[in-house]
């Protein structure tokens, strides 16, 4: 609450209160500023004698003294440094054969070996995208619109196929369905685009057009004419009867993220928080103004020398040099002085022979001697172990092996198989809406240079055309993420699989297990790689091709639902289109191996798809 008013003064002082508790230890005070110079104090008592002064500096070197008394017998001196190397003496007589010398020091480390060849690609790991979350409960279906009125005109005759009609008017928007009962979930990131729906049924055949004028008869066939101008749009026909119910569409993917909602209302005030911890001591305040000089204090009582510790005084000033003292006893040998070197003294008397010294430490290792003369040839050594089996004849048989990496990196040939060339993995071509397939196990599927349209077409009039029709090429794809827009120019490079053609000692074949186990190679054959059983493929216009199941091209090292991409030759772009399909051999469960009907299934998770695809292995016979 607020502070109360000051109370009235008491008439008399009360009794003294009880003794308070000792206060908490205060924080260390800050250093105060230097005070003003005080008045000179009273002369103190005589202090204790000071410490002995520090030794004075060295005096100048004295004059050379007279000859001293011969000293005591000295200790044997240290071994001197080895003298300089003597001159080369005359060659001595050949000595007897020496003892076998010690083992030499280990030699220097050998050079690093050459880089090994790239190993075969391992099996695909499990680093796929996790399974999608559970699907919410579908909302209530909206009301069905009223059917249109039936047409009045009778059906017309079947005419020639007319030009594509104009797009119809948009129909009225149906009423919105009721809100679903499922709780609202979090909106994930936009999913990949869904598959393209099935093509709709053909429209009714138009009326036959008028007959054209008769053409003139020429000797030579003319060039194809220019494209005609599109005719005027025909009148809209009467509405037709309602069609049959369509095939249910595929499950749609998650929609795109919706817009951000409006900010919510302000929440209620929270409860008051707990009291905070005690704060740190504040910074020192500013220095206050200098106070007035204080009064001179009274002289203090005489000091008690026993109660006060004696503080040693400062070293005294060096006193005057005293008189020269008497000659003292010979002291211990001092350290060498810094004066000038004196004159050499007279030679002393020869001392007695010293006691033989202790054996000195072994000397340093001498220099390496000169190389000896070559010895006589030794006896022949024992016969060595037989060497490993050779690689066979000095040439291969001319069989070709094609490897497709399904990445943007060139694959390495197996050990012992030289590489002939590298390139890009061509799957098939489409011209005049007809497909021409390439077996991925043959060398023709590895083109050295990539092009979205690697061919032209020619006619009997000696004229060739390039990039004037909607021709296409299809290539094995790499592991890059699916792009949202068609790729062009340098954007295409990371999406095309690389390949290599190698020379093999024998023909390679593929074996398929039709289950999840890796099939073994035949006896006396070795493995080149393992993979998944790739059967066939289709693209635009239901055109495509397939792989022979004995060909190595039917065993791709990695499984992908979209293993190839389409390149539009004329536009120079590539993309993964929704009408591209890949077909794979599947696993056959043991309970369905006796001519039983398969059960339909839809697999959306990558791991479940891999478990359904047959495994395979490519083998080659030992040479």
From Swiss-Prot:
Which InterPro entries does its entry note?
Answer: Collagen, Collagen_IV_NC, Collagen_IV_NC_sf, Collagen_superfamily, CTDL_fold
Query: How is this chain modified after translation?
Result: Prolines at the third position of the tripeptide repeating unit (G-X-Y) are hydroxylated in some or all of the chains. Type IV collagens contain numerous cysteine residues which are involved in inter- and intramolecular disulfide bonding. 12 of these, located in the NC1 domain, are conserved in all known type IV collagens.
Q: Where is the composition biased (Low complexity)?
A: 81-91, 147-163, 262-284
GO MF terms held by the record:
extracellular matrix structural constituent conferring tensile strength
Primary location class: secreted
Q: Could you tell me which residues belong to the region Triple-helical region? A: 1-392
Q: Name one Pfam family in it.
A: C4
Q: Where is the composition biased (Basic and acidic residues)?
A: 344-353
Any keyword Disulfide bond? yes
* One annotated Gene Ontology cellular component of this protein: collagen trimer
Return the Gly residues bias intervals. Answer: 29-38
Biased composition regions of type Pro residues, renumbered to the chain: 164-173, 230-242, 376-385
UniProt keyword annotation of Zinc-finger present:
no
Q: Which cysteines are joined by disulfide bonds?
A: 413-502, 446-499, 458-464, 521-619, 555-616, 567-574
- Alphabetically ordered keywords of this record: Basement membrane, Cell adhesion, Collagen, Disulfide bond, Extracellular matrix, Hydroxylation, Repeat, Secreted
Stretches for region Disordered: 1-392
Q: Which domain of life is it from?
A: Eukaryota
Q: Name one GO biological process term.
A: extracellular matrix organization
Q: Give the domain note.
A: Alpha chains of type IV collagen have a non-collagenous domain (NC1) at their C-terminus, frequent interruptions of the G-X-Y repeats in the long central triple-helical domain (which may cause flexibility in the triple helix), and a short N-terminal triple-helical 7S domain.
Function of the protein = Type IV collagen is the major structural component of glomerular basement membranes (GBM), forming a 'chicken-wire' meshwork together with laminins, proteoglycans and entactin/nidogen.
Give the family per the record: Belongs to the type IV collagen family.
Output this protein's name.
Collagen alpha-4(IV) chain
Lineage of origin: Eukaryota, Metazoa, Chordata, Craniata, Vertebrata
